[in-house]
C-alpha cells in the first residue's frame, strides 16, 4: 500500500501526521509520500516538498507564489504517473489541492479529502470540484455532510475534528505549569497564529491591547505563544517595537514562548487568538477569548463578495452564535480586545456567561478519534472498490467512478441500458 498525502499548513501537517499513524494500524507496511512539514516527516512520510513552509493566505500572496504552485502540480503528477499510489489524501489548503485532485483522478487514483476546506463559508461553487475529483469527503464539522449531500455530494461522512485527537494525547509540561502558577497576576494568552503573515498582521493590535489593559488592570501578565523559534524572534521584535511606539507602561512585560501553547491556554484567564483551529482548544479549556483576523483593506473588500458564513471562528460556527467575540477587519481592534479582557477579568458574572456555552459545546463536539475513523473509512473504501475492480463483471475503471456511474455501468453490463451511439 502506498499513499500520497498533502498538507499545506501547520495544522494540516499535524493532522496528516496523526492520520499516518492511524493508517499504519490498518496498513503496517504502507509507504507514505507527499507534501507537508516536519510532523509528517516525523510520522514516517517521505516529503517531496516542504509545503508547510509555503503557507500563504489571501489573493496577492498566492499570486506571487504561482510559479512554485505550478511546479508542485507537475511534481505531484509525475509522482502519480511513475509511482502509482493507491490513494491520495488531501488536507484543507484549497487552490493547489484542487489541481492535485484533478491530476490524481486523471491517473485513476482515488482521492480523499480529510478536513475539507470550508467552501460552505466562502466558495460554495467549488462543490462542483468536489463532485468531480473527490471520492470521499471526510468531514470535520458535524453540519458539513448535510451541506454536501444537499449539493449532490453523497460521499461525505462526518468523522470529527482531528484537533481533538491531538488535545487528547498531548502531555503538558508540569514543571512549567507549576512555575507559572506560583507567579502573581492573571495571565492573558496571546495567540497570533501559525503563519508568518498572521503574526505580522495580528500581533501589533494584541500588543497595543496589552498596553491599554495594563493601564486598567495593573498586575495582569501577558504571554505570546509562538509555533517555532523563527516566529518567536519575529514576535519579540514586534512586541519591542510596538511597546516603544505606544509608550507602554514601564511595568508592562510581555513574554514570548515557543512550544508552550497548550500550557499557556491552561494557565490563562483570557485569550486573544487569531481565527483558526486553536479556537477548538480554547473551547475545550472553556477559556473566554476574543478572535481576531486582520487583513488588508483590499482583501477584505474582495472577501466580502465571497464569504457566506456568519462567523469566522470555528467555535461560533459550531454554536451558531457569538460565543467568542470576533473581529475580521483591517482596522485597529486593540480597544475591543482590551475591553472584553477587562470585562472577563473583573466581572465574575460576565465570565460565567462566557464560559457556560463553551462547556456545553465541549460536551457536544469534543470527541477524539477522528484520525482513526478517517483511516477506517479510507481502508473500507479501498477494500470495497478493490473487490469491485476484481469482480469479473466490472471493468477496473468502474472502481474509480462515482456511485451513479457505477450503477449505470452495472446496468449496461446486465443489458438494462443500451449503449450510446457514437
Where are these regions (language model features)?
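Nucleotide-activated sugar donor-binding and catalytic core shared by glycosyltransferases
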Residues: 1-422
Amino acid at each position: 500500500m502506498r499513499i500520497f498525502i498533502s498538507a499545506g499548513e501547520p495544522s494540516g501537517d499535524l493532522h496528516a501526521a496523526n492520520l499516518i499513524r492511524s493508517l499504519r494500524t490498518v496498513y503496517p507496511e504502507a509507504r507514505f509520500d507527499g507534501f507537508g512539514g516536519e510532523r509528517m516527516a516525523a510520522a514516517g512520510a517521505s516529503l517531496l516538498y516542504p509545503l508547510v513552509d509555503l503557507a500563504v493566505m489571501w489573493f496577492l500572496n498566492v499570486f506571487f507564489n504561482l510559479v512554485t504552485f505550478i511546479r508542485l502540480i507537475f511534481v505531484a503528477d509525475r509522482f502519480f504517473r511513475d509511482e502509482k499510489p493507491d490513494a491520495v489524501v488531501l488536507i484543507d489548503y484549497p487552490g493547489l489541492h484542487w489541481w492535485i485532485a484533478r491530476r490524481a483522478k486523471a491517473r485513476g487514483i482515488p482521492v480523499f479529502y480529510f478536513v475539507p476546506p470550508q467552501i460552505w463559508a466562502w466558495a460554495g461553487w467549488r462543490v462542483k470540484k468536489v463532485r468531480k475529483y473527490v471520492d470521499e469527503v471526510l468531514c470535520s464539522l458535524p453540519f458539513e455532510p448535510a451541506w454536501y449531500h444537499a449539493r449532490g455530494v453523497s460521499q461525505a461522512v462526518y468523522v470529527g475534528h482531528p484537533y481533538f485527537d491531538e488535545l487528547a494525547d498531548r502531555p503538558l509540561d508540569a514543571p512549567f505549569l507549576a512555575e507559572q502558577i506560583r507567579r502573581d497576576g492573571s495571565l492573558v494568552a496571546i495567540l497570533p497564529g501559525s503563519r508568518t503573515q498572521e503574526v505580522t498582521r495580528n500581533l501589533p493590535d494584541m500588543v497595543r491591547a496589552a498596553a491599554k489593559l495594563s493601564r486598567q488592570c495593573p498586575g495582569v501578565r501577558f504571554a505570546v505563544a509562538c509555533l517555532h523559534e523563527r516566529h518567536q524572534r519575529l514576535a519579540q521584535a514586534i512586541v519591542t517595537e510596538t511597546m516603544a511606539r505606544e509608550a507602554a507602561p514601564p511595568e508592562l512585560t510581555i513574554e514570548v514562548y515557543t512550544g508552550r501553547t497548550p500550557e499557556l491556554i491552561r494557565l490563562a484567564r483570557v485569550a486573544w487568538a487569531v481565527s483558526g483551529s486553536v479556537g477548538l482548544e480554547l473551547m475545550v479549556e472553556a477559556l473566554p477569548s476574543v478572535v481576531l483576523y486582520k487583513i488588508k483593506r483590499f482583501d477584505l473588500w474582495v472577501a466580502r463578495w465571497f464569504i457566506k458564513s456568519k462567523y469566522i471562528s470555528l467555535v461560533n460556527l459550531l454554536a451558531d452564535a457569538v460565543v467568542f467575540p470576533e473581529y475580521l477587519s483591517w482596522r485597529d481592534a486593540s480597544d475591543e480586545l482590551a475591553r472584553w479582557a477587562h470585562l472577563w477579568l473583573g466581572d465574575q458574572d460576565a465570565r460565567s456567561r462566557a464560559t457556560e456555552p463553551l462547556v456545553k459545546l465541549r460536551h457536544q463536539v469534543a470527541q477524539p478519534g477522528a484520525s482513526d475513523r478517517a483511516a477506517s473509512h479510507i481502508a473500507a473504501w479501498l477494500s470495497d472498490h478493490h473487490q469491485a475492480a476484481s469482480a469479473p463483471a466490472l471493468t477496473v475503471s468502474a472502481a474509480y467512478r462515482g456511485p451513479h456511474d457505477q450503477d449505470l455501468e452495472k446496468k449496461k453490463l446486465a443489458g438494462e441500458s443500451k449503449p450510446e451511439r457514437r
